[in-house]
Amino acid sequence: LIANSPLAEQYFKFLNLSLSLSFISIELTLLKFINYGLMTIFFFVVGLEIKRELTSGHLASVRNAAAPFIAAIGGMALPALIYLAIAGGSAVQGWAIPVATDIALAVGILVLMGERATDGMKTFLLALAVIDDIGAILIIAIFFSTGAIVSWLVAALGAVLAVFVLQKLGVLQIYVYFIVGILLWISLYKAGIHPTLAGVIMGLLTPAVAVSAKNHEHLVDVEDGTLTIVEKLEGDFHRFSAFIVVPIFAFANSGIELSSAAIKAAIASPIAWGIFAGLVIGKPLGIFLTSKVAVAAKLVELPVGTKNQALVAVGS
C-alpha cells in the first residue's frame, strides 16, 4: 500500500539508506541489511528446527528425510522447464526466477494452516522450502554469478570445518559458534553467495547435546531437567525471528509499484507469463508428481495422513 501512496518516495528512500560496516569493508542499503543480515537469524532458526526434526522428529529416518529433498527437486525442475517453454528465446536467462520458494511466506502459510495441517506436514513444508531456497542460491551462484572469489569460498569452507573441529573438541560455548557464524557470513558475502546461507548452515550444525533446562521448561516436556542446545537456541530466537524479523522483512519487500502501464506490460510479456505459470502450475505439480513417483518407488515416506490435496497445497 505504501509503495502506491503519496509516501512511496519516502518509503523507497528509507529502504535505500546506506549502512557502512567499514571494519569489514561492507556497504549495505537498509533493504540489503534486512534481507542479508536480519534474515540470517530467521534462517538460523529454520535450520535449528530442521536439525531438531532430523535428530528426534519427523525427519529422523532416511526415507522421511529424503521426501522433502526429492519433492524439492521436482519443485525446482518443472517450473524452470515451463518457464523455458513459454518464455525461452532471449529470455532464457530468467529460468531461475520461478525456481525458488519464498521461505518466509511458506512459514506464514504454516501459521495460517494451524491445526488443519499435521506436525509432519508442517515439517515437510519447512524442509522443502529450505532445500528449495538453498537450491535457488546454488543455482544463482553456479550459473549466474559474475565469478565467486575463490579465497573467500575457501574461508567459508574453513569456517564450516572449524565448527566440526570445535564439536570434536567438545566446545559447547555458544559465543564461540556465534563468532564462527559471523566469519562464515562475511566469507559468503565476500564470495558473492547469498550470506543467509550461513544461518541455515550454523543451525544444521548446532550440536544436539543436552544442557540444563532451567528457565526453559516451556520449550519441551522436560522430565530429567535437560533439553538440547538446539531446542534452547530455538526457544531463545524463535520469538524474535517470528515477531520482529519476519514482519520487517515483509514490510521491506512488499513494496511493489502498480500502474496501468506496468500491468499492461506484464500481460504482454512472455517472461511474466513464464514466471507465473512456473510458480502457479509448475511448482505444485512438480512437487506432487515427484513425491508420488518417489513413494511408488518406495524411496521415501510422506508424513502420516498426507492426502493429495495437502500435497498440492504444500507446493502452492
Which role fits each region the language model picked out?
Residues 53-80, 149-158, 259-285, 310-316:
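Entry/N-cap segments of selected transmembrane alpha helices
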Residues 113-208:
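Functional cores that coordinate and move charged inorganic groups
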Residues 176-183, 187, 198-306:
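Predominantly late transmembrane helices and immediately cytosolic-facing juxtamembrane segments
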